[in-house]
Regions:
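Short coil-to-beta microelement around the adenine-binding A-loop and adjacent beta1/P-loop entry
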Residues: 25-26, 84
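Conserved ABC ATPase "signature" region
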Residues: 74-75, 91, 110, 121-135
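ABC ATPase NBD Q-loop/coupling interface
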Residues: 68-85
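Short coil-to-helix segment of the ABC ATPase nucleotide-binding domain corresponding to the Q-loop/switch region
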Residues: 102-112
């Protein structure tokens, strides 16, 4: 029997009753969220409210224990191929602008295109410099 996806029409990201615990601490409690293509969202809340954990679960840097996360029609589950496809397409901005503080901004911007998309260093740097020129 095939599983029916309940993702709202054209949703880019859907979280359905997502739960996450750190030991006994229930950090994400039945989170439901729908993000449409092109929509920008901001997760606001006090320290410890689950903002970063939610973002990390969407990119499967953290594993949620219950519920469903669907990104562009791809359900995040144990299938590593699904996780890799989502990581290639989903960009995230964390609380700190540099993911790897020991690296330059340029190296932070080129590491994913080079390692995940197998772009040459020159191509990745060219794209990064074009993007930096916009800010």
């Amino acid at each position: 029997m095939s599983q029916i996806l309940l993702q709202p029409a054209n949703a880019m990201i859907t979280l359905e009753n997502v739960n996450k615990w750190y030991g006994q601490f229930h950090v994400l409690k039945n989170i439901n969220l729908t993000v449409q293509p092109g929509e920008r969202i901001v997760l606001c809340g006090p320290s410890g409210s689950g903002k970063s954990t939610t973002i990390r679960c969407i990119n499967h840097l953290e594993e949620h224990q219950q519920g469903r996360i669907v990104v562009d029609g791809i359900e995040l589950n144990e299938d590593i191929r699904n996780i890799e496809r989502v990581r290639q397409e989903v960009g995230m901005v964390f609380q700190h602008f540099n993911l790897f503080p020991h690296m330059t901004i340029l190296k932070n911007m080129t590491i994913a295109p080079m390692q995940l998309l197998h772009k040459s260093k020159e191509e990745a740097e060219k794209t990064a410099l074009e993007l930096l020129g916009r800010v």
